Amino acid sequence: MGQKVHPNGIRLGIVKPWNATWFANTKDFADNLDGDFKVRQFLTKELQKASLSRIVIERPAKSIRVTIHTARPGVVIGKKGEDVEKLRAAVAKIAGVPAQINIAEVRKPELDAQLVGDSIASQLERRVMFRRAMKRAVQNAMRLGAKGIKVEVSGRLGGAEIARSEWYREGRVPLHTLRADIDYATSSAHTQYGVIGIKTWIFKGEILGGMPAANAVEPKGDKPKKQRKGRK
């Protein structure tokens, strides 16, 4: 089943944190979820050239805090922080509550599945041969310390009449191992022959002991009972 299930979804709460962390009542849940979707859609469209990895949304006390993980923080921030202020105002308007924007830099974009997939997509749109783009991405990831990487492209590869899939892998990608830190993402390239889909799996090693305490959810349980001292 490791081949069928979504690699990120099956690891949530084990070695993967959620991209949205908030709790809501039944009547507010749908509005919050719709607001999250619109905020992500807006930021993804606005920051197409900023090498966007992922967007984390938190909702503390009738406000919204958005953390943007990007390989090019300067593009997001803009000159003297002007662009961030515009984004904050736009997000506050969409969500309907005060907004805060945080920027987190992705130090090694070659080890981020979303950024690797987007890079391959942009190369395919520039008519680079798909095998060359795949091999270059795999070699860069392995050179920077990945334990394993697999890239799959599907569609009318090279302008072929019949669509097909091809994949390239180096190292290990253990999808059945839940403690394995596997970064998975999808991307798409819009070429003159049609859309080509790209899937990327990057294995960074095993995480022993689960998520860090900051991301893990503390289990709710009864307080340990005090032991009575026996008579001597």
Swiss-Prot record:
Residues 213-232 are annotated as: Disordered. The keyword Hydrolase does not apply. It comes from the Bacteria. InterPro entries: KH_dom (IPR004087), KH_dom-like_a/b (IPR015946), KH_dom_type_2 (IPR004044), KH_sf_prok-type (IPR009019), Ribosomal_S3_C_sf (IPR036419), Ribosomal_uS3_bac-typ (IPR005704), Ribosomal_uS3_C (IPR001351), Ribosomal_uS3_CS (IPR018280). Coiled coil: none annotated. It holds the Pfam family Ribosomal_S3_C. Residues 39-107 form the KH type-2 domain. Keywords: Ribonucleoprotein, Ribosomal protein, RNA-binding, rRNA-binding. One of its GO terms (cellular component) is cytosolic small ribosomal subunit. GO terms for molecular function: mRNA binding; rRNA binding; structural constituent of ribosome. Signal peptide: none annotated. GO terms for biological process: translation. Part of the 30S ribosomal subunit. Forms a tight complex with proteins S10 and S14. Binds the lower part of the 30S subunit head. Binds mRNA in the 70S ribosome, positioning it for translation. PANTHER family: 30S/40S RIBOSOMAL PROTEIN S3, SMALL RIBOSOMAL SUBUNIT PROTEIN US3C. Belongs to the universal ribosomal protein uS3 family. NCBIfam families: rpsC_bact. HAMAP family: Ribosomal_uS3_B. This is Small ribosomal subunit protein uS3. It comes from Vibrio campbellii (strain ATCC BAA-1116). The lineage of its organism: Bacteria, Pseudomonadati, Pseudomonadota, Gammaproteobacteria, Vibrionales.
